């Protein structure tokens, strides 16, 4: 028989840097999960993606065991890395902070494809372009 799920915890943690301090500790402590076991496993699984923020969905079962799924980094994080900027524009409609090429947008869309509910790569590109526009990043061909 399948184990009964008691909680699903969603977090965004820097790759390879999970530790028992907030926000990880309190979120998992409430669910009764072995925090160190999660941190070690997460850090091992994301060591190759250093510098990126990784969304993770932790499923906690009745016997306090857990499984987790890592997702692709948020589009905004990937766009900031591609444009080489620290943060997006405070007023994206007035001042633009960076410019990136359309092929870079395609690359990000291809990376995000498993987590997006887009039918085609073009639809995924439009989603990423929308995120870029809202951050004050200009896309050029």
Swiss-Prot record:
<comment type="function">
    <text>Forms part of the ribosomal stalk which helps the ribosome interact with GTP-bound translation factors.</text>
</comment>
<dbReference type="GO" id="GO:0006412">
    <property type="term" value="P:translation"/>
</dbReference>
<dbReference type="InterPro" id="IPR020784">
    <property type="entry name" value="Ribosomal_uL11_N"/>
</dbReference>
<comment type="similarity">
    <text>Belongs to the universal ribosomal protein uL11 family.</text>
</comment>
<keyword id="KW-0689">Ribosomal protein</keyword>
<comment type="subunit">
    <text>Part of the ribosomal stalk of the 50S ribosomal subunit. Interacts with L10 and the large rRNA to form the base of the stalk. L10 forms an elongated spine to which L12 dimers bind in a sequential fashion forming a multimeric L10(L12)X complex.</text>
</comment>
<dbReference type="GO" id="GO:0022625">
    <property type="term" value="C:cytosolic large ribosomal subunit"/>
</dbReference>
<protein>
    <recommendedName>
        <fullName>Large ribosomal subunit protein uL11</fullName>
    </recommendedName>
</protein>
<dbReference type="GO" id="GO:0003735">
    <property type="term" value="F:structural constituent of ribosome"/>
</dbReference>
<keyword id="KW-0694">RNA-binding</keyword>
<dbReference type="InterPro" id="IPR020783">
    <property type="entry name" value="Ribosomal_uL11_C"/>
</dbReference>
<dbReference type="GO" id="GO:0070180">
    <property type="term" value="F:large ribosomal subunit rRNA binding"/>
</dbReference>
<keyword id="KW-0488">Methylation</keyword>
<dbReference type="InterPro" id="IPR036796">
    <property type="entry name" value="Ribosomal_uL11_N_sf"/>
</dbReference>
<dbReference type="Pfam" id="PF00298">
    <property type="entry name" value="Ribosomal_L11"/>
</dbReference>
<dbReference type="InterPro" id="IPR006519">
    <property type="entry name" value="Ribosomal_uL11_bac-typ"/>
</dbReference>
<dbReference type="Pfam" id="PF03946">
    <property type="entry name" value="Ribosomal_L11_N"/>
</dbReference>
<dbReference type="InterPro" id="IPR020785">
    <property type="entry name" value="Ribosomal_uL11_CS"/>
</dbReference>
<dbReference type="InterPro" id="IPR000911">
    <property type="entry name" value="Ribosomal_uL11"/>
</dbReference>
<dbReference type="InterPro" id="IPR036769">
    <property type="entry name" value="Ribosomal_uL11_C_sf"/>
</dbReference>
<keyword id="KW-0687">Ribonucleoprotein</keyword>
<keyword id="KW-0699">rRNA-binding</keyword>
